[in-house]
């Protein structure tokens, strides 16, 4: 910004972009997203608990505490295995992250900023949806690559903030729509709760522990959505 003093002398005032703050806000959003997508993939791809029925009191009394715990854990860990609702949410998230946005006449995608998932065969188990930022010193996979994101922030912060704001707003909005109350799923659940209750109502007492597990999942996912929203708000406040 150029201004003049009362003596008619020109003074130039420059404002530096807080590259680190914007970078951290974006990285925080990916940290929360990666945690969420990985946990969902783990739940969806969990091992089958076929043959493991909820234990009766008599069956529990004939087993050790350790045996009961392992048995029930096997059931709980598979509650969301191959769940249609969860799969739909996962696909929505992954499709949204592949979106591109036009800003000032130019199209941008995550790859424009050096952000991508690993190859199908090189990524770890349940990590095919996890994103890595080139040049991230804390990421052993991409730390040696050129830091395109930081360079983009330094040269054109408005475009960077605009892109990531649009991207994560889309993800957050679509997730909210997917998880809204419907005839088959209650709000903010990732399994067909109403359908399950109808099909297995006679086992209400036997699946109480399983229901507690589901509640834990719901709380976990909701907290991650909130964390993503908080990170998005911080990013929007940078400009």
Question: Where do the model's predicted regions map?
Answer:
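Short, compositionally biased, intrinsically disordered N-terminal export/targeting signals
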Residues: 1-4, 144-146, 191, 227-230, ...
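Structural flexibility/helix-modulation signal
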Residues: 19-26, 32-205, 217, 239
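Active-site beta-strand/loop architecture of penicillin-binding DD-peptidases
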Residues: 2-5, 203-206, 210
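Threonine/glycine-rich low-complexity segments that form extended coil/beta-edge repetitive scaffolds
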Residues: 1-10, 14
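Proline-poor, low-complexity alpha-helical tail modules
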Residues: 155-159, 208-239
